[in-house]
Amino acid sequence: MAQETLVDTSIQGKIVQCIGAVVDVEFARNQMPKIYDALKMEGSSLTLEVQQQLGDGIVRTIALGTSDGLRRGNIVYNTGANITVPVGKATLGRIMDVLGAPIDERGPVDQTLTAPIHRKAPAYDELSPSQELLETGIKVIDLVCPFAKGGKVGLFGGAGVGKTVNMMELINNIAKAHSGLSVFAGVGERTREGNDFYHEMADSGVVNLDKLEDSKVAMVYGQMNEPPGNRLRVALTGLTIAESFRDEGRDVLFFVDNIYRYTLAGTEVSALLGRMPSAVGYQPTLAEEMGRLQERITSTKVGSITSIQAVYVPADDLTDPSPATTFAHLDSTVVLSRDIASLGIYPAVDPLDSTSRQLSPAVVGEDHYNTARAVQGTLQRYKELRDIIAILGMDELAPEDKLAVARARKIQRFLSQPFHVAEVFTGSPGKYVSLAETIRGFKMIVAGECDHLPEQAFYMVGTIDEAFEKAKKM
């Protein structure tokens, strides 16, 4: 197991109450554990984490594992330290749980280097903002919401609009070409997706099964079937591994799927601890918990962490407290829309709702900026005219509006793109489109150089040249 540290058995307490994942433990008054101390069960690998001090020597803890079989009177030892997990090269190519224990049946993880999962965010004077762009090869993202190297990106979307597929495509396009290291934290998502991800990484060589230390990714999973304590802490475990690589001076990619489940686990734990719920039933400490995690996901003068986080949007409501709290911490937001998905346009990114702090002439250049704004302006005009078209039809529009609608429909279709990870479903090979090609294509459509082509020619192609080729065959 990951936590084979020597435990001081002199500081011991006993369980006085057990309600689901919440366990109350009584110690001598002068030996009360501190908040976030890890406690070990006698004769068991179960770890408890202290959440509250109730007084009279009693602490309230969360079980990081199943609490089946616990009884009042069971002996518990205080380790006197936070939960520590293995970090560094030993984690590469491995799948670990919240405590850093291996779950890939490939032997124990080397414990030479370990780090506590709770630590302070870097000081303000250590931070290093980045102006460098990270090309993703996905047209709509590179054009309207470009990513910064060392920035934070959120993929927002309701159920079934393609968050995980987009995340996998980004991993495919960035992590495989990226010379640095990646850390993937599966927080409360489906085990099947974690399994698929591992096999895909192994097939592409990012995980080197013959020589694990040559792998480029470390994986930490706390999936849907885990107790709330595991799901709440697994993001911190993944982040701790990413921070250790960053502090070695590396550029790290940190993928989290899904931040909403982290919030949800916090809600469950908060209710179990007996705290009064806040807006929409969320924990009163929602903003603080989110801030504590997000403030640590940052780039310093030593190395960078570029994080891409999937964020589930409950009932497609972006004003829900959970996604709304996440928004404030991000540099780029990619909003996936059910309306666009229903048109069959994938990736279903809403170009009018998605934003990026990088989209300014000073960062991306005048050409990119003007093209992106022209594309958004054309789509916005089409959106405004939709009601008129629905009532009166296209014939009643002014000639310039007819032209704007025709171009907007072409832009809309050109924003679609076949993905490498979706080849199995679509049957068409995935396309990686460079930023220069993306700008050239949209510039031509906006300038009217493609007005003679049918709009179907723009659907599910890579570059603008492919659209011309497709039009010839129609």
Curated annotation (Swiss-Prot):
Gene Ontology CC annotation, any one: proton-transporting ATP synthase complex
Pfam families per the UniProt record, alphabetical: ATP-synt_ab, ATP-synt_ab_N, ATP-synt_VA_C
Enzyme class: translocase
InterPro entries: AAA+_ATPase, ATP-synt_VA_C, ATP_synth_F1_bsu, ATPase_a/bsu_AS, ATPase_alpha/beta_chains, ATPase_F1/V1/A1_a/bsu_N, ATPase_F1/V1/A1_a/bsu_N_sf, ATPase_F1/V1/A1_a/bsu_nucl-bd
Known catalytic reactions: ATP + H2O + 4 H(+)(in) = ADP + phosphate + 5 H(+)(out)
Membrane topology, as annotated: Peripheral membrane protein
Principal subcellular localisation of the protein: membrane
Compartments reported by the entry: Cell inner membrane
GO molecular function, one term: ATP hydrolysis activity
Signal sequence bounds: none
Superkingdom of source: Bacteria
Residues that hold ATP according to the record: 157-164
The family this protein is said to belong to: Belongs to the ATPase alpha/beta chains family.
Oligomer and partners: F-type ATPases have 2 components, CF(1) - the catalytic core - and CF(0) - the membrane proton channel. CF(1) has five subunits: alpha(3), beta(3), gamma(1), delta(1), epsilon(1). CF(0) has three main subunits: a(1), b(2) and c(9-12). The alpha and beta chains form an alternating ring which encloses part of the gamma chain. CF(1) is attached to CF(0) by a central stalk formed by the gamma and epsilon chains, while a peripheral stalk is formed by the delta and b chains.
Function as written in the Swiss-Prot or TrEMBL entry: Produces ATP from ADP in the presence of a proton gradient across the membrane. The catalytic sites are hosted primarily by the beta subunits.
Protein name: ATP synthase subunit beta 1
